[in-house]
């Protein structure tokens, strides 16, 4: 069913870039990987596998399948620190730039190490490739409404790549947009608990 849905879209619409989020099982990962075998555009892989609580969302067999089937296809891998540690078999003694370099060895063309889980008044993200390391910094915002920050960032980067932006430009533009979305998040009043960022902050004043 999943492969049929992807095949239907790819055969009907020109797809300029693809973002992959959480894939729960090896069967789902295999279906996505098989469907994208002929796709030659940029692929952004957000390896969602650790909940904000620290609980694992993917079993070990799914993580292994993700590493084997999809990391080598990724134009950009966007892990946070706990996800990077999981992909690197629990290595926690590396700084983010070193984690990014180690993850390049698993196949992605570039890695964006997200620093939102770290401490400090400034969030530091690092774009790591074979040729360079580029930093993207933003002041940490005191809000409880940060649900979906990583997914939103990877989606915004993918949108930039679909518009033929260079990778560092797509990341910088997405970073600016997400900072505004977090800053405006407290204007929303949606449900109980951990609220979402304000995706439409540029339009809803």
Q: Model segments located where?
A:
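Conserved phosphate/ATP/ADP-binding segment of small-molecule kinases
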Residues: 60-133
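Short, small-residue alpha-helix embedded
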Residues: 85-86, 144-167
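Nucleotide and nucleotide-moiety/phosphate-recognizing core
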Residues: 27-39, 109, 132-133, 167-169
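Phosphate-handling active-site elements
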Residues: 133-134, 160-174
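Short pre-catalytic strand/loop immediately N-terminal to key active-site residues, enriched for Gly-Thr
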Residues: 133-147
């Amino acid at each position: 069913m999943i492969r049929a849905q992807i095949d239907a879209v790819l055969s009907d619409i020109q797809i300029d870039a693809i973002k992959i989020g959480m894939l729960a099982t090896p069967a789902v990962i295999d279906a996505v990987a098989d469907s994208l075998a002929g796709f030659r555009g940029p692929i952004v892989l957000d390896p969602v596998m650790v909940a904000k609580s620290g609980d694992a969302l993917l079993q070990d067999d799914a993580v292994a399948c993700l590493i084997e089937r999809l990391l080598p296809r990724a134009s950009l891998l966007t892990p946070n620190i706990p996800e990077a540690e999981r992909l690197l078999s629990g290595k926690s003694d590396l700084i983010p730039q070193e984690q990014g370099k180690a993850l390049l060895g698993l196949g992605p063309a570039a890695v964006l190490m997200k620093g939102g889980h770290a401490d400090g008044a400034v969030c530091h993200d690092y774009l790591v490739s074979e040729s360079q390391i580029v930093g993207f910094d933003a002041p940490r915002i005191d809000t409880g409404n940060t649900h979906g920050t990583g997914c939103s960032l990877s989606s915004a980067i993918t949108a930039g790549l679909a518009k033929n932006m260079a990778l560092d430009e797509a990341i910088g533009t997405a970073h600016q947009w997400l900072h505004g979305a977090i800053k405006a998040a407290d204007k929303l009043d949606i449900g109980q608990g951990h609220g979402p960022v304000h995706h439409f902050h540029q339009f809803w004043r």
